[in-house]
């Protein structure tokens, strides 16, 4: 298990970027005439010396990845030699200490890091037995305990959308997995959608460069599914969390497109934001169904408006320009009170 380097890859969702760190040299102090563990991986004269890439250990920062890469490199590098020895009893020889073994040949003389030590006293003989196993113990439990390494398809992966133009028209997308490789993209991945069925469902494909969570059918990385998009430190939710949540309850439920078209369900009043439903386009056209004030307002970005007010029992129609009523049939105007018509000039035909 000797490698020339150990690379740890992870995903920093606070910055929406890859975390990677590589350790090229172990810091374990066991050294012999053969050098260190990372050197032995180069003795086979391979065109590319073996290296380890770790993608199944979640890390949250570059510093954490650096420490993990170095720790794994130290662990592997310390195992390039196994040794057992016995000597006259000495309580100073214990795990974590270094012993210097001499006169056992150029290849084996050197400094050894003690993994285990046992002191025995038998028949008036005081003896210290040591084992060198790197940073792992050499007991039976450790030997028989297999290390679990999940294959990429056996867990969820972060994906970055690279293509959403499905040639079959099935609404699939392709992604790259930054923690695995920055060069390759996935097979076409089916997108999990609300109410998806024949010519129905919530059609909202992720866009290129969106971060998504990807699962795999039967653990096969060649059969990916997009489970949903996720927010991160660069791609924030459409509304500030202080406006969305009040006292542990979700006050706003918002659907917002890339260009700014918004559909918002307001569950509780807060300031000028009243309970109801609000629709607004990027250009500023608005429809507001206000349950708290018991009215409906329709307003254009240019200032034309209609307000139907149940509380005031009134309807107001305003225009910043001309207004016309056109009917193919009759127009009836009836009021139980007065009808007032006012203008600079009134023409009746």
Where are these regions (language model features)?
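Glycine-centered loop/turn motifs
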Residues: 1-3, 96, 251, 273-274
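An acidic/polar, Gly/Ser/Thr-rich interaction patch typically located in mid-to-C-terminal regions
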Residues: 2-140
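Intrinsic-disorder/coil detector with helix-boundary
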Residues: 101, 313-349
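Short, ordered loop/turn segments at secondary-structure junctions
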Residues: 117-119, 231, 330
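Hydrophobic packing positions characteristic
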Residues: 123-134, 139-327
């Amino acid at each position: 298990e000797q490698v020339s380097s150990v690379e740890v890859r992870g995903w920093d969702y606070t910055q929406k970027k890859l975390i990677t760190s590589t350790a090229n040299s172990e810091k374990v102090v066991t050294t012999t005439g053969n050098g260190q563990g990372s050197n032995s991986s180069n003795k086979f004269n391979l065109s590319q010396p073996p290296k380890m890439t770790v993608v199944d250990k979640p890390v949250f920062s570059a510093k954490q990845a650096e420490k993990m890469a170095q720790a794994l490199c130290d662990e592997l590098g310390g195992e390039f030699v196994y040794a057992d020895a016995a000597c006259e009893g000495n309580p100073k020889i214990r795990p974590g200490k270094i012993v210097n073994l001499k006169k056992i040949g150029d290849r084996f003389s050197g400094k050894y890091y003690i993994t285990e030590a046992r002191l025995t006293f038998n028949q008036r003989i005081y003896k210290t037995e040591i084992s060198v196993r790197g940073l792992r113990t050499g007991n039976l439990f450790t030997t028989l305990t297999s290390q679990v390494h999940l294959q990429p398809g056996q867990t969820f992966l972060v994906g970055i959308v690279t293509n959403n133009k499905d040639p079959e028209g099935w609404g699939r997308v392709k992604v790259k997995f930054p923690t695995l490789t920055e060069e390759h993209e996935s097979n076409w991945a089916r997108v999990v959608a609300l109410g998806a069925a024949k010519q129905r469902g919530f059609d909202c494909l992720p866009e290129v460069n969106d971060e998504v969570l990807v699962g795999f059918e039967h653990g096969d990385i060649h059969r990916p599914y997009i489970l949903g998009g996720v927010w991160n430190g660069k791609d924030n939710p459409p509304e500030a969390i202080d406006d969305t949540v009040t006292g542990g309850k979700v006050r706003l439920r918002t659907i917002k497109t890339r260009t700014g078209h918004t559909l918002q369900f307001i569950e509780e009043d807060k300031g000028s934001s009243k309970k109801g439903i609000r629709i607004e386009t990027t250009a500023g056209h608005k429809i507001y169904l206000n349950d708290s004030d018991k009215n409906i307002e329709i307003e254009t970005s240019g200032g034309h408006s209609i307000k139907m007010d149940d509380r005031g029992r009134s309807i107001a129609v305003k225009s910043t320009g001309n207004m016309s009523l056109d009917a193919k049939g009759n127009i009836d105007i009836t009021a139980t009170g007065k009808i007032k018509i006012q203008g600079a000039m009134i023409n009746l035909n």
